[in-house]
């Protein structure tokens, strides 16, 4: 029986704003995390991810490359981002030309165990637990299901007001 090649995890080449709190163990590399944000244990955030100010990334979340998260967002336990849309009917198998970006606006809350495919989500959105977001979300509201659908619209808020 062969021995496995062991690779280290931890924090490598990550950039942090002021007052960022990280609970280890984590796997953060090549990412940027904004001021006053929190990263829970067992989180992986990959290179070139940008996370805004005052965000919470809860335990066991997976944030892959090409993801941008706005300010005042919550990524709940076990949420997962996917950049491979299986455009050719199967996985990209590392072919980065097939990967697509994901963008979350400000004041977005992603529920536990939700899966976010390559989409854009506008400001002031709540994605329910276990939802699968397959298409762009262009209207503030609460979305849930597989595929995620609008359950309820959210009224516009003034700048700086938190709806989450």
Features from the language model and the residues they span:
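C-terminal/domain-terminus segments
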Residues: 124-133, 142
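Acidic, glycine-centered active-site loop in nucleotide-sugar glycosyltransferases
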Residues: 139, 144-147
